[in-house]
Curated annotation (Swiss-Prot):
Organism of derivation: Bos indicus
Catalyses which reaction(s): a ubiquinone + NADH + 5 H(+)(in) = a ubiquinol + NAD(+) + 4 H(+)(out)
UniProt-recorded name of the protein: NADH-ubiquinone oxidoreductase chain 1
InterPro entries, per the entry: NADH_UbQ_OxRdtase_su1/FPO, NADH_UbQ_OxRdtase_su1_CS
Gene coding for it: MT-ND1
Keyword annotations from UniProtKB, A to Z: Electron transport, Membrane, Mitochondrion, Mitochondrion inner membrane, NAD, Respiratory chain, Translocase, Transmembrane, Transmembrane helix, Transport, Ubiquinone
Localization per record: Mitochondrion inner membrane
Length: 318
């Protein structure tokens, strides 16, 4: 039964990833005043299936100088970790209801750095290594602010269990009292998932394609799927944290519809941002984090810690 549950989680994720690639190409196309993919199937709807078949039947080439085991393990690990991070997400019921779901998410996102590092190192190419080192520095840096923002939000929720956030936000979305945190969280998720304008790891103009430059066919597709699964997962996480949907046990469909719309709008904003903004310079990216976001998030975290202590002495207003 548990295996069926796992499959019921994984298959929709992979389908969502496939069609997100199509949506992205369509959105970017229309924003650049062109059509986007429209040949394979009606309105180009079968394009992702054609892409998947093409990628998986190609011969997976490997550079002669690469480290074989690491080179093959890195994309498998990337997709595995990307799918593992979905386990504690309440939609409205998680696959496994963990007591420390948030810590699990942070641990898994930290591990995702290793797959990028391995792929860059195992490729034995200078471009791949530079891309991987950039990706690792960027991901580790932005994880610091993500963790502090999460801590501040959880102080308002009072639990490390993600399901508690649904109950916390029955009266009011947390984006209203914590909008500076939400803004910094959203920008940090962009950097964490290596999306434009923070896509320095795969800067086509300078690094060819970044850490996955030596990958082709199936292994490349695994990296691609991992990246898009992480984008959807991060947007779902944002919707859970800041745009909590109230759950009525008698009408669970309403929760699903509401929650899906919020997640899709956030994902759409990722695509819109990609179409609108130029890429950051690497030093600007780090400056934004260490000089701007980190002091701000630390100050807000101290505020969120001290606020309950300050207000605990106020008697109830009758």
């Amino acid at each position: 039964m548990f295996m069926i549950n796992i499959l019921m989680l994984i298959i929709p994720i992979l389908l969502a990833v496939a069609f997100l690639t199509l949506v992205e190409r369509k959105v970017l196309g229309y924003m650049q005043l062109r059509k986007g993919p429209n040949v394979v199937g009606p309105y180009g709807l079968l394009q992702p299936i054609a892409d998947a078949i093409k990628l998986f039947i190609k011969e997976p080439l490997r550079p002669a100088t690469s480290s074989a085991s690491m080179f093959i393990l890195a994309p498998i690990m990337a997709l595995g970790l990307a799918l593992t991070m979905w386990i504690p997400l309440p939609m409205p019921y998680p696959l496994i209801n963990m007591n420390l779901g948030v810590l699990f998410m942070l641990a898994m996102s930290s591990l995702a750095v290793y797959s990028i590092l391995w792929s860059g190192w195992a490729s034995n190419s200078k471009y791949a290594l530079i891309g991987a080192l950039r990706a690792v520095a960027q991901t580790i840096s932005y994880e610091v602010t993500l963790a502090i923002i999460l801590l501040s939000v959880l102080l308002m929720s009072g639990s490390f269990t993600l399901s508690t956030l649904i109950i916390t936000q029955e009266q009011m979305w947390l984006i209203l009292p914590a909008w500076p945190l939400a803004m910094m969280w959203f920008i940090s998720t962009l950097a964490e998932t290596n999306r434009a304008p923070f896509d320095l790891t795969e800067g086509e103009s300078e690094l060819v394609s970044g850490f996955n430059v030596e990958y082709a066919a199936g292994p490349f597709a695994l990296f691609f799927m991992a990246e898009y699964a992480n984008i959807i997962m991060m947007n779902i996480f944002t919707a859970i944290l800041f745009l909590g949907t109230s759950h009525n046990p008698h009408m669970p469909e309403l929760y699903t519809i509401n929650f899906t719309i919020k997640s899709l709008l956030l994902t759409m904003s990722f695509l819109w941002i990609r179409a609108s903004y130029p890429r950051f310079r690497y030093d600007q990216l780090m400056h934004l984090l260490w000089k701007n976001f980190l002091p701000l998030t630390l100050a807000l975290c101290m505020w969120h810690v001290s606020l309950p202590i300050l207000t605990s002495g106020i008697p109830p207003q009758t």
